[in-house]
Amino acid sequence: MRNLLILVVVVSTIVATNVHANTGVAIVHGTGNPTDAYNKYWGSKFVESVRQGLDNSSNLIVVNCNFDKYMWDDAAAGCLANDLYNFINSKNISDLVVITHSNGGNVIRWIMSNPTFDTRYPTIINNIRWVNAMAPSSLGTPLADAVMQGNVFEQSLGWLLGFKSDAVRQQQVSWMAYYNQSWLLGTSGRPSLPKGFYTIVGTDVESAIWDPDSYCGGYFENVGLETTQNWLDRCSDGFINCSSQRGAGTLWFNDKDRTKGREPLSHNQSRRQCFNLDVILRNDI
């Protein structure tokens, strides 16, 4: 399906227009309220590697929004819409590739699912080529339920998920089931999203102290994710079950099918320069 879409886009461009698309990239973080997502959420090496896929290297934006709020909140989707709308207009972007991680996939899916909610949404939707969603929490995660119930996870997951924020509450499994059925497109039994939503799925966590791969993205973070994986399905990235990551849109690939050395991507590694993920994303622009 993805290859067919690429073929259609290429052929349509050749025969239908002489106007060269102006491609841009928006990189959208997950849960949290960062002020410097470029350095602290993604890492400069990841962002600058992805940037190399652009003809015009200035056509890239790294979003900083308050994704501790509900996805529809003005500080979340409103902030994202403002950044994307201004980016599209100021740079004359006509071909926007959106790269998301974790809960960021839910926020962009809210925008694509509710075009009448905000006057900026149609412009954004019309100019999106597709979304590449890394480890999206499309069906929620049991760990959000655990945090909201106030058990032992609340402290141990604070660095990853936050502490009983609106976004954590939203990502409870039953809550996401409601939103998917009522407000969001792209899941089973629901209409398709207006633009492609292609998922990259993290299937496992490795944290062996003797394995150099365990240190990519942060060794202690991977140790923590391997611990939380004990409360998830066998196929998970330590934070989100594979079934949730595949829950909306179209599967692009499972980590081991494309990564260097067939390495799995933990939830922390899927936002860092690990195992050629950055190169895969760069080559897809």
Regions inferred by a protein language model and the residue ranges of each:
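Sec/Tat signal peptide C-region and signal peptidase I cleavage site
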Residues: 15-21
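Short aromatic-enriched loop/helix-cap "lid" or pocket-rim segments at secondary-structure transitions
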Residues: 39-40, 141-147, 152, 209-216
